[in-house]
Amino acid sequence: MRVAMMAAFAGAITFAGPAFALDKVTFGTNWVADPEAGGYYQALEDGTYAKYGLDVTILQGGPTSNGGMLLIAGKIEFFMGGDMIGDFLAVQNNIPTIAVAAHFQKNPQIFMSHPGVGLDKWQDLPNANPAFVSAGAVNTFWAWMRLAYGFKDDNIKPYNFNSAPFIAEPHSIQQGYLTSEPLEVERQGGFKPNVFLLADYGYTTYSTIVETRREIVEKHPDIVQRFVDASSIGWYHYLYGDNSKANEAIKRENPEITDDQIAFSIGKMKEYGIVDSGDTLKLGVGAMTDERWSGFYNTMVKAGVVKSGIDYKKAYTLQFVNKGVGLDLRPK
């Protein structure tokens, strides 16, 4: 398996080579190896990328990495971005990147509450005090929550990615990620928290968005198409097939992850339709639509997260998705 750390890269990977050679590309993830990138590891490990003529290196991210900058600098060809806000900000700041697929139809961002204390429904949460929210969230999804549901800034306490304060305060709420924090709370606190997926309450951004540079789309559309198709097939195989080799690869790259965590993450992605739901049921995994992009852009403008008047359509292209690739791989 060709997975490298960021320090190994001194220059851009080129596409040139003999006709019989696989096209070499590097895909950077936005975090350390985990099931949330499982479809890409699956496509690498089960030979799907090779079948599509690609020699893919997965460059795992982490707390000190910046794969987005590597993409801009030409050090990698594809990057696993976060949500659509980053793509809007790229347009706003004239950064020449573009979204070519969305492998999470729902953003896994959640809020959690303690059960049985009057915070069991979404409509109970705006008055919860304290609300443990990170600095980055205050100006993104919390801004939407404040506008759409009346959540209060006065209730915020800093969330430093440690759930102990939330566990200790029964009337608090805390942000989290569907596939990780609920299990952490269950392990450390001894209870199952209430989980509220923001996507189910109107936070309609895509996530795990495959990004590349505009020049690659213009000069090498065939490579982009093959990478998108193979990655989407990888996600079908990871969710519905034998994912053991991908999980072993994830554990090699991230020795701290446990089998329980992997199983929990995969289970939640399937239970909540993170990858395969909505438009993907007809268009295929990775699907995107103009309506979703325009709707979320308008929502973020109203919330003050992005500027009005930018050409948000430059943030993405539908050229490589919505072709039904892999639909036959979903269990009947």
Question: At which residue positions do the language-model features occur?
Answer:
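Pocket-lining segment of extracytoplasmic ligand-binding domains
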Residues: 85, 161-258
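N-terminal signal peptide c-region/cleavage motif recognized by signal peptidases
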Residues: 16-18
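Secondary-structure end/capping motifs
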Residues: 218-305
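Short helix-capping segments at alpha-helix termini
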Residues: 20, 48-51, 149-151, 188-190, ...
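Bacterial N-terminal signal peptides that target proteins for export
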Residues: 1-6
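Conserved C-terminal helix/tail region of periplasmic/extracytoplasmic solute-binding proteins
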Residues: 290-332
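Short, glycine-/small- and polar/acidic-enriched structural segments
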Residues: 22-179, 196, 204
